[in-house]
Design a protein with these regions (language model features):
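N-terminal transmembrane-helix/juxtamembrane module of multi-pass inner/ER membrane proteins
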Residues: 2-66, 85-160
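Aromatic-anchored segments of alpha-helical transmembrane domains
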Residues: 43-51, 98-102, 186-194, 274-283
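Interfacial segments of alpha-helical transmembrane regions
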Residues: 88-96, 161-210
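Membrane-interface loop-to-helix entry segments
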Residues: 145-159, 240-261, 289, 293
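Membrane-interfacial alpha-helical segments at the cytosolic side of multi-pass membrane proteins
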Residues: 162-169, 250-267, 297-308
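Membrane-interfacial catalytic/cofactor-binding modules of polytopic membrane enzymes
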Residues: 195-262, 325
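Interfacial helix-loop-helix junctions of multi-pass membrane proteins
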Residues: 200-202, 244, 276-302
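Membrane-proximal cytoplasmic C-terminal regulatory module of class A 7TM GPCRs
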Residues: 309-347
């Protein structure tokens, strides 16, 4: 075999992967949820400072390695021009980073033991005409409804994955906006939790689990114990949700509903699901009404900030919806032969065109 023919052989797989990785990093950063990463990096820095200063021991080596692997895969796939799989990997990395950073940071903030504000939050509800005790007993007296609300409340565990897969194809730019808005919302809600810590209405009104024998979710009674432990010296990281005000669950319900608008056909069911999830935040999550109002306001503010940032800083066009690609158009052309599906597609595309023109 001649030297020329030898040099023409394919490079080893690792060299190809390394070339894709190096080529993909700059473009991945341009296409990524950059603002979300900046917010998470700031939170990670604060977590490191507070952990050292307050004596928390936190060394998540396994999850950190998983995060690095996901980012490397995202960069390599970007370099290979597999942009939708790269988007999935990058978003999975953000979700991993969120789990790594946010619950431990909430634990550190709770341990700073700022004065509890339950009385003030309950008073705001009362001035809005809300009788929280009567409302809680009404839900208790309707156990079937409460059971449904509990299952809907838990949908925030699987909705991010469903939206990740659906929006990667249907509307990648909407996915990036939702991920970024969620990161900003988390940062703001943690800051609110630090300034206005609270245990929740079940604790404030002295309800016990015996008062709600059919309750499935016991976190409204466990959450005050976790917070009290941190406030009195415990240095164990808590990975359960302990933020009361503003309600991140309510904020995420609003952001999820907006995200589902970008999903053809089934998006309307996602919107309805999140309307119910927003309501379930009160009896199941144990939130004051003002928590929900503040959470919704934070979500809208965060979404506006995300839109403004990317509009001002993007240097390359966003990844287009799959329905506008060659493969997507062929698929839609085949579906248009079916009258019912054709009507749904036309309606969805018409709505998407209006939203694009408005943006």
């Amino acid at each position: 075999m001649s030297i020329a023919s030898f040099t023409a052989l394919p490079k080893p797989m690792w060299e190809v992967a390394w070339a894709y990785l190096r080529a993909g990093i700059p473009e991945l950063w341009q296409r990524s949820s950059r603002l979300a990463w900046m917010v998470l990096a700031g939170c990670a820095g604060l977590l490191a400072i507070l952990s050292i200063a307050m004596g928390f021991h936190y060394a998540p080596f396994l999850l950190s390695a998983q995060l690095v692997i996901l980012l490397a895969l995202a960069a390599g796939l970007t370099g290979a021009r597999w942009l939708r799989p790269a988007l999935i990997m990058e978003t999975a990395a953000i979700l991993t980073a969120t789990f790594l950073i946010v619950p431990p940071l909430c634990s550190a903030l709770a341990a700073m033991a700022m004065p509890l504000q339950d009385a003030a939050l309950a008073e705001i509800d009362r001035r809005m005409g809300i009788d929280w005790i009567a409302m809680a007993f009404w839900f208790r007296d309707n156990p079937e409804l409460s059971r449904v609300l509990c299952h809907v409340y838990a949908s925030n565990l699987w909705q991010p994955v469903a939206l990740l897969l659906a929006l990667t194809a249907a509307d990648p730019e909407r996915l990036r906006l939702m991920i970024t808005a969620s990161a900003i919302t988390l940062a703001i809600t943690m800051f609110g939790f630090f300034l206005i810590p609270a245990m929740g209405p079940y604790w404030y009104f002295h309800f016990t689990p015996a008062d709600f024998p059919d309750a499935i979710n016991v976190m409204p009674w466990e959450q005050p114990k976790l917070i009290e432990g941190l406030r009195t010296g415990s240095r164990e990281m808590v990975f359960s949700g302990i933020v009361e005000f503003p309600s991140y669950h309510a904020a995420s319900a609003l952001l999820f509903a907006i995200a589902w608008r970008g999903v053809p056909v089934i998006g309307v069911f996602g919107i309805l699901l999140n309307i119910v999830m927003f309501v379930s935040t009160v009896p199941v999550g144990g939130h004051y009404i003002i928590d929900l109002c503040a959470g919704a306001a934070v979500a809208l503010l965060s979404l506006s900030l995300a839109k403004r940032y990317y509009r001002a800083t993007d240097r390359i066009p966003p990844l287009e919806p799959w329905t506008r690609t060659r493969e997507g158009r062929r698929f839609l052309a085949a579906l248009r032969k079916r009258p019912i599906v054709s009507a749904l597609i036309k309606r969805t595309l018409k709505t998407s065109s209006k939203e694009a023109a408005t943006a």
